[in-house]
Swiss-Prot record:
Location relative to the cell: Secreted
Catalytic EC class: hydrolase
Keywords: Calcium, Disulfide bond, Hydrolase, Lipid degradation, Lipid metabolism, Metal-binding, Secreted
Protein name: Acidic phospholipase A2 4
Organism the protein comes from: Craspedocephalus gramineus
Cofactor binding annotation: Binds 1 Ca(2+) ion.
Disulfide pairings: C26-C115, C28-C44, C43-C95, C49-C122, C50-C88, C57-C81, C75-C86
Task of the protein: Snake venom phospholipase A2 (PLA2) that has high lipolytic activity. PLA2 catalyzes the calcium-dependent hydrolysis of the 2-acyl groups in 3-sn-phosphoglycerides.
Length: 122
């Protein structure tokens, strides 16, 4: 669920996903086209691809189960589809954390007209 994704980003990356990544580059936020502009935008591209591979549940609307163990997010539950959503979100949150140093404000509210290049495949 997107609200859980926001929570994971806060826990792992220590910042608001909605504020920092809700409209960043070509892939963070709604939609996505063109080429990722930097490492943080690539996190969103990979996350979009990950969601695209999920079958049998809705990544944006379905709630999943996770726990925290020694500071790490551990995806759980009996539903493999929902667990897959959790793994997508967890990986993206870690990616955001690992690329905070190269986050560039020039890609915040980046105009879609700058994302016209052909997209690479997942």
């Amino acid at each position: 669920h997107l609200m859980q994704f926001e929570t994971l980003i806060m826990k792992v990356a220590g910042r608001s996903g909605v504020w920092y990544y809700g409209s960043y580059g070509c892939f963070c936020g709604a939609g996505g086209q063109g080429r990722p502009q930097d490492a943080s935008d690539r996190c969103c591209f990979v996350h979009d691809c990950c969601y695209g591979k999920v079958n049998g549940c809705d990544p944006k609307k379905d709630f999943y189960t996770y726990s925290e163990e020694n500071g790490d997010i551990v995806c759980g539950g009996d539903d493999p589809c929902k667990k897959e959503i959790c793994e997508c979100d967890k990986d993206a949150a870690i990616c955001f954390r690992d690329n905070k140093d190269t986050y560039d404000n020039k890609y915040w509210f980046f105009p879609a007209k700058n994302c016209q290049e052909e997209s690479e495949p997942c």
